[in-house]
From Swiss-Prot:
Quaternary structure note: Part of the ribosomal stalk of the 50S ribosomal subunit. Interacts with L10 and the large rRNA to form the base of the stalk. L10 forms an elongated spine to which L12 dimers bind in a sequential fashion forming a multimeric L10(L12)X complex.
HAMAP family recorded: Ribosomal_uL11
Protein known as: Large ribosomal subunit protein uL11
GO annotation, cellular component aspect: cytosolic large ribosomal subunit
UniProt PTM: One or more lysine residues are methylated.
Function: Forms part of the ribosomal stalk which helps the ribosome interact with GTP-bound translation factors.
Alphabetized Gene3D superfamilies for the sequence: Ribosomal protein L11, C-terminal domain, Ribosomal protein L11/L12, N-terminal domain
MF (Gene Ontology): large ribosomal subunit rRNA binding; structural constituent of ribosome
Length: 141
C-alpha cells in the first residue's frame, strides 16, 4: 500500500546551499519534517548546480517522512546567463535589456525540455523565446 500524502511544498533553493534559515526552515518545520535531513540530502543531490536556483517539490507523508523532486533551473536564469545580464528590462516591450541568439534559445530549450509543456524542440524554443520577450530580451536569428 502506498504512503498517505500529507501535502506538497514547493521551494526554490540555490543548488548545494540549503540551510535551516528561511525560507527552508519555516516551510519544513510547519510540516514536522527533519530540516537537517532534507538539507543534507538536497545539498548532496544538487552539488553540480552550485549557485543556481533549483526548484524543488517536496512530498510530505503523514508519518513525517518526505521525498523530493528536483527540477531544472528556471528558464529566466538560463536566459539571463546567455545574455550576460543580472536582470531583465524594467519595462519589457518598451525597452530592450539585451539579446540572445536563436541558437542559444535552442540550447536553453534542450536543457529545459523535460520541465516544459512541449512535445518537440520547436515548440520548446517558442516557449523560451516568449519568456525572453517577457523579460525584455530580444531573440535574434
Amino acid at each position: 500500500m502506498a504512503k498517505e500524502i500529507s501535502g506538497y511544498i514547493k521551494l526554490q533553493i540555490m543548488g548545494g546551499q540549503a540551510n535551516p534559515a528561511p525560507p527552508v526552515g519555516p516551510a519544513l518545520g510547519q510540516r514536522g519534517i527533519n530540516i537537517m535531513e532534507f538539507c543534507k540530502a538536497f545539498n548532496d543531490k544538487t552539488k553540480a548546480f552550485a549557485g543556481k536556483p533549483i526548484p524543488v517539490v517536496i512530498t510530505v507523508y503523514k508519518d513525517k517522512k518526505f521525498d523530493f523532486e528536483i527540477k531544472s533551473p528556471p528558464a529566466s536564469h538560463f536566459i539571463k546567463e546567455a545574455a550576460k545580464l543580472k536582470g531583465g528590462s524594467k519595462e519589457p516591450g518598451r525597452s530592450i535589456a539585451g539579446s540572445i541568439t536563436k541558437k542559444q534559445a535552442e540550447e536553453i530549450a534542450t536543457q529545459k525540455m523535460k520541465d516544459l509543456n512541449a512535445h518537440d524542440l520547436e515548440q520548446a524554443v517558442k516557449i523560451i523565446a516568449g519568456s525572453a520577450r517577457s523579460m525584455g530580451i530580444e531573440v535574434k536569428d
